């Protein structure tokens, strides 16, 4: 080729393949190579063995090649083989190479007939090979055998497509000559991925096994079934030759003799056979690499830029340098502190758009989950009134009280305040859980130092647990402070006079039925989940919740109201999701066992996320719709047992007024307590836990890490990180070397140009049989035409027969003769004759011969 740099291209690509295969990125970079495709038992592996000159590939019946074999042939003075997975081991016995291929295949695919797309990289050094890189792929098959899955045909096809769809991959389409070439699996795949034929090279095997009297001359001359890069014929060893231990050197000599002695192929002998195929593939692969150099250079440069920043940290890396470890430790601690603060306080960078995280989840706990838990702890209305009535009667004792006792108010309030402890402690637990989760998220960046990550998580988590006790003590102190003194002079407390006035107003409202303007608590979309399919199925509506009722509309314009439901006597319960449902569901039901909506005992409402469900539940709590409790039925039965007392209560108007007054006072004071607790709980947790943890990370974490032991052990890298660093450095140097070699290559080197396009429509129609089975190209002398005058020099095919009588006088056109064998066996093959236009014969004269004076005018010809 006149340029030493061009000869180095194939070894360069081999080095790139090894470097990229080692780091698992071979599929990302489209390296120039040759993929060998063909049907099962088409002779692909035999062609590769002929290249090497050794028996080294597994043989047998059915599918033998079950993993892609990347075969890198390197011209060298000594002969040996190396596997990428057996680094440093040289195989001089090629029988061991065969056994290693079988063993490596079984390690991944199993001992039966399974397949895998993971390639085996084999490099063969030999003085008998040219620099070449080929990929031997599993043969295409139709029927699964052994433990192969039923879709083995599609699995193999998908594996082939991973290689042949790449623009830089040449396709070596191997087809046997003794089968219909127009139905060749290899050519079908090649046509599908390379419709222009720019990457496809045809190989015809088993030429010696064709039926007697047939040959593939027209195919090999690229006339019958043309490909842009043409065909090359080879003759492999038969099974008898293999069983007889016929070596490949003798097989190549027999192949050469076959082409020289065969009458149909002797004129093509210098362009047939395995040595010529190897030479052509070497030349075409080298030219293909040269043609793809600009694109390959761009991909290499982009790959280099993508890893350059990371490799920059590794260039001067010294594992035992104490200064490096100290610097890395300081950087890791500082990065962890910054990440933790950003996750808690919020930041514009690295925003999670899929779910809430860090501070956003804690905010949701403070302002949605905690208020919800507070409201859940309130008494049921009937139970609360019953307890107030018992308290009033027990305070009066044997006497009949004339005034409402304030001791009843204090007793009920203290009982209510004590119940706040549970949701407050639960709030602390939820915040702790989120903090620990945030710590683990922030330490993910420390994966390269597993000991440091483990120790850092342990120290910070231990500190959070220590602050947990202090925070819970302070929360309990807040509740005890509320229990210590009932401040009935609070500016927001209604007092006895206002409570009695409100009680009277409520009675008037019940009798008059007048309604003031109602405040809207929440609006939003919900899906009614339990409507039957016959009635339209689940539908989404626009819901409006107020303190008095729940309404839903067709859309958010609120023009077409579908239904309005009173919230009196309603409660909430959770509903399990259906098997195929992705929505989260809760239900409304009537405590008096009445239908809630039409014929339904409960109204099932669905949301997309659990957060929406929790938010709607909190809104329903504000409207007085509480969750169902486990003890509701027991309390209901107790109420029935004490039905006489309830009846007596309802019969005593004075007691009923006193109960209503205390109820209003309790509501007013508990609203003050809840407001205070909802305000102080986030502040307490922020001060004692979250802010304290941030300060600990910034000021004391590093000191704790230094005091925990040996820093060298703490900063030990993980094995995965060390391996990744070595692989990244190896790939970086391989990329730099590749770009350096490519830069030295003269890309203007003259090479064999791409052949011109050919008519390959036969691949689409696929109706032409393989081989020269028609008499149009029979090489044998069995069907010779009668002796005819010699043809003009340079003419193709036999001369036409003598003209029929009357043809010189303008009669019917001559009937074409059936072509026979070419008189010159080394001359060009005969052309395939076209169908002549049929013309009617001339009308003969009475004498049986046309008169010279009255020539017979021919009738105009017509086409059938």
Curated annotation (Swiss-Prot):
InterPro entries, per database record: Dynamin, Dynamin_GTPase, Dynamin_GTPase_CS, Dynamin_N, Dynamin_stalk, G_DYNAMIN_dom, GED, GED_dom
Gene Ontology molecular function: GDP binding; GTP binding; GTPase activity; identical protein binding; microtubule binding; phosphatidylinositol-3,4,5-trisphosphate binding; phosphatidylinositol-4,5-bisphosphate binding; protein homodimerization activity
Mutagenesis or variant effect for residue 334 to R: Significantly decreases receptor-mediated endocytosis
Post-translational modification note: Phosphorylation at Ser-774 by GSK3B/GSK3-beta leads to inactivation of receptor-mediated endocytosis in non-neuronal cells. Dephosphorylation at Ser-774, through the EGFR downstream signaling, leads to activation and regulates early stages of clathrin-mediated endocytosis (CME). Phosphorylated by CDK5 leading to synaptic vesicle endocytosis (SVE) activation.
Region (G4 motif): 205-208
Region (G2 motif): 64-66
Quaternary organization: Homodimer; homodimerization is mediated by the dynamin-type G domain which promotes assembly-stimulated GTPase activity. Homo-tetramer formed from two dimers in the absence of lipid. Oligomerizes into a helical polymer that self-assembles around the vesicle membrane, when associated to the menbrane through lipid binding.
Keywords: Cell membrane, Cell projection, Coated pit, Cytoplasmic vesicle, Disease variant, Endocytosis, Epilepsy, GTP-binding, Hydrolase, Membrane, Methylation, Microtubule, Motor protein, Nitration, Nucleotide-binding, Phosphoprotein, Synapse
Residues modified to 3'-nitrotyrosine: 125
Cellular localisation: Cell membrane; Membrane, Clathrin-coated pit; Cytoplasmic vesicle; Presynapse
Disease: Developmental and epileptic encephalopathy 31A: An autosomal dominant epileptic encephalopathy, a heterogeneous group of severe early-onset epilepsies characterized by refractory seizures, neurodevelopmental impairment, and poor prognosis. Development is normal prior to seizure onset, after which cognitive and motor delays become apparent.
Name of the top EC class for this enzyme: hydrolase
UniProt effect for mutating residue 41 to A: Impairs assembly-stimulated GTPase activity. Does not affect basal GTPase activity. Does not affect membrane binding. Does not affect self-assembly
Pfam families tied to this protein: Dynamin_M (PF01031), Dynamin_N (PF00350), GED (PF02212), PH (PF00169)
Span list, region Disordered: 767-864
Gene field: DNM1
Superkingdom, taxonomy of origin: Eukaryota
Residues the record lists as Omega-N-methylarginine modifications: 796
Coiled-coil stretches: none
Protein name (record): Dynamin-1
Effect noted on mutating residue 778 to A: Increases clathrin-mediated endocytosis (CME). Increases interaction with SNX9
Binding-site list for GDP: 41, 43-46, 59-60, 206, 208, 211, 236-237, 239
């Amino acid at each position: 080729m006149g340029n030493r740099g061009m000869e180095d291209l194939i070894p360069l690509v081999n080095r790139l393949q090894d470097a990229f295969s080692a780091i698992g990125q071979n599929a990302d970079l489209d390296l120039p190579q040759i993929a060998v495709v063909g049907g099962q038992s088409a002779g692909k592996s035999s062609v590769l063995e002929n290249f090497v000159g050794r028996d080294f590939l597994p043989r047998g019946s059915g599918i033998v090649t079950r993993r892609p074999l990347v075969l890198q042939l390197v011209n060298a003075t000594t002969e040996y083989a190396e596997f990428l997975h057996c680094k440093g081991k040289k195989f001089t016995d090629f029988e061991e190479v065969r056994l290693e291929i079988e063993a490596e295949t079984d390690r991944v695919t199993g001992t039966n007939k399974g397949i895998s797309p993971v390639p085996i990289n084999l490099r063969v050094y030999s003085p008998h090979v040219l620099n070449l890189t080929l990929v031997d792929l599993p043969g295409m098959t139709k029927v699964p055998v052994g433990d192969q899955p039923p879709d083995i045909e599609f699995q193999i096809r998908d594996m082939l497509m991973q290689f042949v769809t790449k623009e830089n991959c040449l396709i070596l389409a191997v087809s046997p000559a003794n089968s219909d070439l127009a139905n060749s699996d290899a050519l079908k795949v090649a046509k599908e991925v390379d419709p222009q034929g720019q990457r496809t090279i045809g190989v015809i095997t088993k030429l010696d096994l064709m039926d007697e009297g047939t040959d593939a001359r027209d195919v090999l001359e690229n006339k019958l079934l043309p490909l842009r890069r043409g065909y090359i014929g080879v003759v492999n060893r038969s099974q008898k030759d293999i069983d007889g231990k016929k070596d490949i050197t003798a097989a190549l000599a027999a192949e050469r003799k076959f082409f020289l002695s065969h009458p149909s192929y002797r004129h093509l002998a210098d362009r047939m056979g395995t040595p010529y195929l190897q030479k052509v593939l070497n030349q075409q692969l080298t030219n293909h690499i040269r043609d793809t150099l600009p694109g390959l250079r761009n991909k290499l440069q982009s790959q280099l830029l993508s890893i350059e920043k990371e490799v920059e940290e590794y260039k001067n890396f010294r594992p035992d340098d104490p200064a490096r470890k100290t610097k890395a430790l300081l950087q890791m601690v500082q990065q962890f502190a910054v990440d933790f603060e950003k996750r808690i306080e919020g930041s514009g960078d690295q925003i999670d758009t899929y779910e809430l995280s860090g501070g956003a989840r804690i905010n949701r706990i403070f302002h949605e989950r905690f208020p919800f838990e507070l409201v859940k702890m309130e008494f049921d209305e009937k139970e609360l009134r019953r307890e107030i009535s018992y308290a009033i009667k027990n305070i009066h004792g044997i006497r009949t009280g004339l005034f409402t006792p304030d001791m009843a108010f204090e007793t009920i309030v203290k009982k209510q305040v004590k119940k706040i402890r549970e949701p407050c402690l639960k709030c602390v637990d939820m915040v702790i859980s989120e903090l620990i989760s945030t710590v683990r998220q922030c330490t993910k960046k420390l994966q390269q130092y597993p000991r440091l990550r483990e120790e850092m998580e342990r120290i910070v988590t231990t500190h959070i647990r220590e602050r947990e006790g202090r925070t819970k003590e302070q929360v309990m102190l807040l509740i005890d402070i509320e229990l210590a003194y009932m401040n009935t002079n609070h500016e927001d407390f209604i007092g006895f006079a206002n409570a009695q006035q409100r009680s009277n107003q409520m009675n008037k409202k019940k009798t008059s039925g007048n309604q003031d303007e109602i405040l809207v608590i929440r609006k939003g979309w919900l899906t009614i989940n339990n409507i039957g399919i016959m009635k339209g199925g689940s539908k989404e509506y626009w819901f409006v919740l107020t303190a008095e009722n729940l309404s839903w509309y067709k859309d958010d314009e609120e023009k077409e109201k579908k239904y309005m439901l009173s919230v009196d006597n309603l409660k909430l319960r959770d509903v399990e999701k259906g098997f195929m449902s992705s929505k989260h569901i809760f239900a409304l039901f009537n405590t008096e066992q009445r239908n809630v909506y039409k014929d339904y005992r409960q109204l099932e409402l669905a949301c997309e996320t659990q957060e929406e469900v929790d938010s709607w539940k909190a809104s329903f709590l504000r409207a007085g719709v509480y969750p169902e409790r486990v003890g509701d039925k027991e309390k209901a039965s107790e109420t029935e047992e004490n039905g006489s007392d309830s009846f007596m209560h309802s019969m005593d108007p004075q007691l009923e007024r006193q109960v209503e007054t205390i109820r209003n006072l309790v509501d007013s004071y508990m609203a003050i307590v809840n407001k205070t607790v909802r305000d102080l709980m986030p502040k307490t947790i922020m001060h004692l836990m979250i802010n304290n943890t941030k300060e600990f990370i910034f000021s004391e974490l590093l000191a704790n890490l230094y005091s925990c032991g040996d820093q060298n052990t703490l900063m030990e890298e993980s094995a995965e990180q060390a391996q990744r660093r070595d692989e990244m450095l190896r790939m970086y140097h391989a990329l730099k070397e590749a770009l350096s070699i490519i830069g030295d290559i003269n890309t203007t080197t003259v090479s064999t140009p791409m052949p011109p396009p050919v008519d390959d429509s036969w691949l689409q129609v696929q109706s032409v049989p393989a081989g020269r089975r028609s008499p149009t190209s029979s090489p044998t002398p069995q069907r010779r035409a009668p002796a005819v005058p010699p043809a003009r020099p340079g003419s193709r095919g036999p001369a036409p027969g003598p003209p029929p009588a009357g043809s010189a006088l303008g009669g019917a056109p001559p009937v074409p003769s059936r072509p026979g064998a070419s008189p010159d066996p080394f001359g060009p093959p005969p052309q395939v004759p076209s169908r002549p236009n049929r013309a009617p014969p001339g009308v003969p004269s009475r004498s049986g011969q046309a008169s010279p004076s009255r020539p017979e005018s021919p009738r105009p010809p017509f086409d059938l």
